């Protein structure tokens, strides 16, 4: 059985359309015009136990609404979601013991309490037995390296320390599923790497199923087994990072370093179209569709125009592919 099951999930919001001016405001008050907005449209997917799923999309795509339904905050208009065999909205008090949630821009920690005291409070909230609590704290201390600041008040923690502390708080009760919303937002490179290593270790050692939403595509490449991308509430891609690159990463770039003193313009490339050619000084970059053109033909044409010192092939990275998705270029 899948750890996360989503079938024909739909969420509609009804909003009132307000007309401008005093008359419009009065008319809207007496006879309000209602419009239905479909935030999530017929989503269906499954996440097996132990998988890290990158759940991505542009702002307004429906990610947050979907997460709120999966965590039991919102009730679906139709369809259903089931986490570890439980429907989130049916018995939230029991259900939340199966999940952990981390929001990068919000904290679940108590600002004025020392971090250790916060975990003690959470132990009581989640009804964690003493023996399990000490075992979990030993594990989380080791993985997330909390020992240097665990006695400090939460308000004194740096952003990176607070994020590690939040992840530990969400894992204290040993949840089956972890929802991570922008876990590395605002962090520097080294701290991001530490957070990613910790998430990977937790996933591998405990088989925790993780649903990750992020705009940092390095998180996706380094952490996720699979990508589920939505736009306007609908699925537009479901597959691995390599499948995404294979399907949509057909654009490649040949980057040439020219010998100095060649100031003439690039000649017309006979038989080629839809290529982007960028010449700056001794650098020449040619972007082309590898499903239509052979790189050898482009290199041959370029060698007939210029003397080349060096060249390299650059594949389209995941960030560029998803950027094109957002711009509706794919």
Predicted regions and their residues:
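Conserved ABC transporter NBD signature motif
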Residues: 79-90, 95-96
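Conserved ABC ATPase "signature" region
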Residues: 21-29, 120, 124, 131-149
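Conserved catalytic motifs of ABC-family nucleotide-binding domains
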Residues: 174
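Catalytic Walker B motif of ABC-type/P-loop ATPase nucleotide-binding domains
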Residues: 178-182
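ABC transporter nucleotide-binding domain
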Residues: 196-289
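Conserved ABC ATPase signature
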Residues: 112, 153-157
């Amino acid at each position: 059985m899948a750890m996360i099951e989503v079938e024909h999930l739909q969420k509609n919001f009804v909003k009132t359309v307000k007309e401008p001016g005093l008359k419009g405001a009065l008319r809207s008050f007496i006879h309000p015009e209602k419009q239905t907005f479909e935030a999530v449209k017929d989503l269906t997917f499954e996440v097996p136990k132990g998988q890290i799923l990158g759940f991505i999309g542009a702002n307004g795509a429906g990610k947050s609404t979907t997460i709120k339904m999966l965590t039991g905050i919102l009730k679906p208009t139709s369809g259903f979601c089931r986490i570890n065999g439980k429907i989130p909205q049916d018995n939230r008090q029991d259900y939340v013991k199966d999940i952990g949630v981390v929001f990068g821009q919000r904290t679940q920690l108590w600002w004025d309490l020392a971090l250790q005291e916060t975990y003690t409070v959470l132990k009581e909230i989640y009804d964690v037995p003493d023996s399990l609590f000490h075992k979990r704290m030993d594990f989380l201390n080791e993985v997330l390296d909390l020992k240097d600041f665990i006695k400090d008040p939460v308000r004194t923690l740096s952003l990176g320390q607070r994020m590690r502390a939040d992840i530990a708080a969400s894992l204290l009760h040993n949840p089956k599923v972890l929802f991570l919303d922008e876990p590395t937002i605002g962090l520097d490179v080294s701290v991001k790497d530490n957070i990613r290593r910790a998430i990977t270790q937790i996933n591998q050692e405990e088989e925790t199923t993780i649903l990750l939403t992020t705009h940092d595509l390095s998180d996706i490449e380094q952490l996720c087994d699979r990508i589920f991308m939505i736009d306007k509430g609908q699925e537009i891609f479901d597959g691995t990072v390599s499948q995404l690159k294979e399907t949509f990463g057909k654009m490649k770039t040949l980057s040439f370093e020219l010998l100095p003193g060649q100031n003439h313009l690039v000649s017309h490339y006979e038989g080629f179209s839809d290529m982007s050619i960028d010449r700056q000084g001794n650098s020449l970059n040619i972007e082309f569709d590898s499903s239509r053109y052979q790189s050898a033909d482009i290199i041959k044409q370029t060698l007939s125009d210029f003397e080349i010192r060096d060249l390299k092939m650059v594949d389209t990275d995941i960030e560029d592919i998803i950027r094109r998705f957002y711009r509706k270029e794919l």
